[in-house]
Regions:
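A short core secondary-structure module
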Residues: 158-204
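C-terminal helix-coil-helix/basic helical segment that borders enzyme active sites and/or dimer interfaces
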Residues: 36-37, 303-335, 348-349, 454-457
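A short, Trp-centered hydrophobic/proline-enriched beta-strand micro-motif
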Residues: 123-132
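A structural signal for short hydrophobic beta-strand segments in well-ordered beta-sheet cores
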Residues: 146-149
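N-terminal glycine-rich flavin-associated loop
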Residues: 92-112, 138-141, 276
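Amphipathic, small/basic residue-rich leader segments at the start of a protein or domain
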Residues: 1-96, 108-109, 113-123, 421-505
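Alpha-helix capping/hinge segments and adjacent helical runs
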Residues: 326-414, 481, 485, 491-493, ...
Length: 505
């Protein structure tokens, strides 16, 4: 009896769960099929999906009382990391399901609708996604036109959504809409509704699929919504719907490092492996100083992303309300996605011509990681918001000097000493947006340095910590120099006249 109990307990440990999942990925991508060839086509064969989903990976985001593993952030990030080491689109597929459907349902859905939904995820390999973006309202989600009204005991929802990951593939959706007011206007607040594609009245029509540039595994498209859902499928906000949306999106952004972790590690492993084997004269590529610098950049990204995962595991669980944690959520999402793109670019660069193939992990990685810098808030917008929120805090605290303020701010206090000389200036008010973007990048990197130091305190190896801090100091010094440049160059709309070089040759 004791032996059986021990066996069951071992089977339930995270390490065993992840090992089984990784084995399923190897079988699906290297034995059943060839991941490099699969990456040339859209979607995945049913047999490959079945092998992967047989391990019930999405159980990590389902509460234990419904048969899941407990919605533990550490486990969710470990799953995302394991998936992204082999396939970034697969990891994003799981990220959409976890952060944009299962976690919101766990936290905000009525109890009577949870059990059947979670059961289908556990036993029928169901999937879910989130619909916010509309053709005319991308980042301007608060002005969305999708609307709802009461229809007896139900809600009637109409509108148009697009660029939702898993378009036509998800079984469930969280659809965002604004209530119709008696005067014909739409309410300012936003509500979320669960839809079930198995119910005819709740089916969302796919008008067309898009030919997305990368992430071939994930279908995107244009959706027309004209559905009727029961009242109990409306999510219940703790205060306002907008704050619920912020909580959901901030949690999602804080879990981006899980998708970045395995991806960056794969770029690092591929780059080191290639440079170790590629001979130039009597030495391999690792003998070149420029190559050492490039690979150390990827290694710094690996360390920073590890620290972000460590931090996210402690703060982004569904028990916490993250609606007011915009600085931290934006900093994590924007910086880690920039690091993902840079790591892929560097891996391709050292791989030479072989990397310039969609069937090569680095070439594919550039195209697949690029949209991460755009969706869920473009990075320029997020960096701008970080800077604006920080300037507001500095104004409220009556501390104009950036270094002095960061030395007292809880997210940067531990790392501020490393940058005190570089950041010994007052940003001032009325910065141009391009300067706000630079300031946001600076702040996000100081926050990341604090994460790295916190991870070091828990035993992470010192040489990786030292290298990552050095690269962060270099990046911040470069960004500060940009702040001092009085660049006000703007685009010239009518640039053609007098600019044809042939006329002067």
């Amino acid at each position: 009896m004791t032996s059986l109990s021990t066996h069951i307990a071992n089977e339930n440990t995270l390490s065993v769960f992840i090992q089984r999942f990784e084995r399923a990925l190897r079988e699906a991508f290297y034995e059943q099929a060839d991941i490099n060839q699969l990456s040339l086509q859209r979607g995945l064969p049913a047999a490959v999906w079945t092998r992967i989903m047989n391990e019930v990976p999405l159980s990590v985001a389902i509460p234990t009382e419904y048969g899941g593993r407990g919605s533990i952030v550490k486990e969710c990030l470990a799953l995302l990391s394991a998936a992204s080491y082999e396939s970034l689109p697969l990891s994003l597929t799981f990220g959409i399901n976890i952060a944009l459907f299962l976690e919101p349902v766990s936290k905000y859905a009525n109890e009577q609708v949870k059990a059947p939904i979670f059961d289908r995820f556990l036993t029928q390999q169901s999937m879910g996604g989130l619909m916010i973006t509309e053709p005319d309202y991308g980042s301007d989600a608060l002005n969305m036109r999708t609307s709802y009204r009461t229809a007896g005991e139900d809600y009637r929802i109409t509108g148009t959504k697009h660029w939702q990951g898993l378009t036509g593939q998800a079984d469930f959706w969280l659809v965002t809409a604004r209530g119709q007011l008696p005067n014909g206007e739409l309410a300012r607040d936003i509500d979320f509704f669960i839809t079930d594609n198995a119910v005819p009245a709740q089916q969302i029509k796919v008008e067309r699929l898009y030919n997305n540039l990368g992430l071939y595994m994930i279908p995107y498209g244009l959706n027309t919504i004209d559905i009727q859902v029961p009242a109990q499928q409306r999510l219940v906000a703790e205060s306002t719907g907008i704050k619920m949306m912020l909580d959901i999106l901030h949690r999602s952004r804080m879990q981006f490092p899980g998708m970045g972790m395995g991806f960056i590690k794969r770029m690092l492993d591929e780059a080191i492996g290639h440079c170790s084997q590629r001979m130039v004269g009597s030495s391999n590529l690792l003998a070149l100083d420029s190559v050492q610098f490039q690979l150390s950049r990827i290694q710094a990204a690996y360390t920073i992303c590890s620290a972000m995962c460590h931090r996210s595991s402690h703060i982004s669980g569904i028990a916490n309300n993250l609606a007011m944690e915009g600085i931290e959520a934006n900093a994590m999402k924007a910086l880690v996605t920039d690091l993902m793109q840079e790591s892929a670019q560097l891996c391709l660069q050292v791989s030479g011509a072989n990397g310039y193939k969609i069937s090569h992990i680095a070439g594919r990685g550039i195209v697949d990681s690029r949209p991460f810098q755009i969706f869920e808030g473009s990075n320029e917008m997020l960096y701008t918001q970080i800077a604006e929120m920080m300037i507001k805090k500095m104004r409220k605290g009556k501390e104009p000097n950036l270094a002095a303020f960061l030395a007292t701010y809880d997210l940067t206090r531990d790392a501020s000493a490393y940058f005190k000389d570089t950041l010994d200036f007052a940003p001032g008010e009325g910065l141009m947006q391009r300067k706000l973007v630079d300031l946001g990048k600076i702040i996000s990197r100081v926050i990341a340095a604090s994460y790295v130091l916190a991870l070091a305190n828990d035993g992470f190896r010192d040489d990786l910590v030292t290298g990552s801090i050095e690269h962060l100091r270099r990046d911040i010094a470069h960004l500060v120099s940009n702040l001092y440049l009085d660049s006000r160059v703007k685009v010239i709309d009518d640039y053609v006249t007098g600019s044809d070089w042939l006329s002067f040759t």
